[in-house]
UniProtKB/Swiss-Prot annotation:
Post-translation changes: Auto-AMPylation at Tyr-183 in vitro.
Coiled-coil parts of chain: none
Species of the source: Neisseria meningitidis serogroup B (strain ATCC BAA-335 / MC58)
Record lineage: Bacteria, Pseudomonadati, Pseudomonadota, Betaproteobacteria, Neisseriales
Alphabetized PANTHER family for the sequence: PROTEIN ADENYLYLTRANSFERASE FIC-RELATED
Protein name (record): Protein adenylyltransferase NmFic
Fido domain location: 37-162
Other information: Defined as class III fido-domain containing proteins, in which the inhibitory helix is present at the C-terminus of the Fido domain.
């Protein structure tokens, strides 16, 4: 039996609609109105991707969550943690990745964190370094392993992503293939 969300849609149908929403975010130019590097900006992205699909789209979670034995930031301290993350510097690639890792540890939403946060990361990279990650060249296995280890040491993640940076920040093919790859990381496959 397919897993369902609170509104009663299958995960596959949620992923398909959310992927459509992600493409529309870029095609419409709405991406240019997103706050860059802030919690509010991440909430805007999440709401855009998952609005109408999840009741909690764009809302900071109030429950504790874990994945694969890893507990994300305690809900009791989450808002305070997000303020501190938002204040982290974004001047260098290393600082940006450190901020990305902390946002991943915070995991502010009940679902859809990875897909939203990768778009958020690219916006921060684009604004500050005039680069984005060419996600289609980033191995799912290597990326997930690096993310799993990143709370202890983000060196592996930095090397993996730095090797796949591009200054072709407005290339639609790179953007859309990257979005599809991002959904693939989360288990989505067409068909």
């Amino acid at each position: 039996m397919p897993s369902e969300n609170p509104i009663g849609k299958t995960m596959k149908s949620i992923d398909e609609q959310s992927l459509h929403n992600a493409r529309r975010l870029f095609e419409s130019g709405d991406i240019d109105r997103i706050e860059v590097g802030t919690t509010a900006g991440l909430q805007q992205i999440h709401r855009y991707l998952f609005g109408g699909l999840y009741d909690f789209a764009g809302q900071i979670r109030e429950d504790n969550i874990s994945k694969g034995g890893f507990r994300f930031a305690n809900a009791m301290y989450l808002k305070e943690a997000l303020v501190k993350i938002e204040q982290m510097p974004e001047r260098t690639f290393e600082e940006i990745i450190a901020k990305y890792v902390e946002m991943n540890i915070a995991h502010p939403f009940l679902e859809g964190n990875g897909r939203s946060t990768r778009i958020w990361l690219d916006l921060v990279l684009k604004k500050n370094l005039k680069k984005v990650v060419n996600w289609q060249n980033v191995s799912k296995t290597l990326y997930l392993q690096a993310m799993e280890r990143s709370p202890v040491n983000d060196l592996e993640l930095r090397f993996l992503l730095k090797d796949n940076l591009t200054d072709d920040v407005d290339n639609r093919e790179i953007i859309f293939k990257g979005i599809e790859q991002s959904y693939y990381y989360e288990g989505y496959e067409k068909g």
